[in-house]
Design a protein with these regions (language model features):
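Positively charged, small/polar-rich N-terminal and surface patches that mediate targeting and assembly
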Residues: 1-113
């Protein structure tokens, strides 16, 4: 049985302060909106300290629910404006979404399918 995903979750992990740029680019590429979450980086790099206090790099996560058709243009727009080679330092990826409830625009789209 084939499971065709109609939706994707586009995830962008950005340096703090670049979520507005990412959302503007995504909207211009077809996104209807998104969610921004504040985060801290934790990984391979040693923590910086300032007067003995650990300072972790601040990040922002941008989450955008998109249709499969708008996923690639949204990702390309975000990469162009805040990708890894820009000051935004963005890492962008997508995940398949199997079910969506409670979002009118997506519910209307599903009824057309």
């Amino acid at each position: 049985m084939e499971n065709k995903n109609v939706y994707s979750l586009v995830v962008a992990i950005l340096n703090r302060g670049f979520s507005d740029v990412a959302m503007s680019a995504a909207r211009n590429a077809g996104a209807k909106g998104g969610t921004v979450i504040s985060a801290r980086s934790s990984g391979l790099h040693e923590e910086e300290t300032f007067f003995g206090i650990s300072i972790l790099p601040e990040k922002e996560l941008v989450l955008i629910l998109s249709t499969e058709e708008t996923k690639a243009p949204i990702m390309r727009a975000i990469i162009k404006h805040v990708g890894i080679e820009t000051e935004g330092g963005g890492i962008i990826f997508s995940l398949p979404v199997t079910d969506v409830e409670g979002i009118k625009a997506f519910e209307d789209f599903s009824k057309k399918q």
